[in-house]
């Protein structure tokens, strides 16, 4: 188990991808894919588990699946349609980021439906118990690694990339639901 700093836009300690038992939890943006692949040392992941589909967590997913076409991807059922057809996600992101969208997050590719397994919460996926945790996003899930009791919480709690101790609350537009998040 290790965190892989994908060095977003060349900056360390901004976005991290966890590698757990050969699986990638939140591979990050496509703009950082080359760094992620280098740090994986050419090894094919076993699966991708997404806590949510925001671009800083999931934008590299389609490109990774294009590289390894049989790679399974796990995501909440509300996020799955936007991985399969990212057009609405991209339209929303373009309103927010404008002409910086591709620079910041890379080229977002669709994930074939055959690769996507939807989650609702309560499942166990490859030794990871899934919890539905809306608030930060309506399609947010967390994963509990049952062997080590380690939780992978995406942005539902806060943002911190080891080895730093800095914790930042994640509050992105447009779908933050503070009341659900506080539950």
Residue ranges, per PLM feature:
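Short gly/pro/ser/thr-enriched loop/turn and capping motifs at secondary-structure boundaries
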Residues: 79-83, 159-160
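Short, glycine/acidic-enriched loop or turn micro-motifs at the edges of active sites
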Residues: 29-30, 55, 139, 158
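Metallo-beta-lactamase
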Residues: 83-131, 138-183
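Core dinuclear metal-dependent hydrolase active-site scaffold
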Residues: 19, 121-146
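Conserved beta-strand hairpin/beta-sheet module of binuclear metal-dependent hydrolase folds
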Residues: 1-43, 143-153
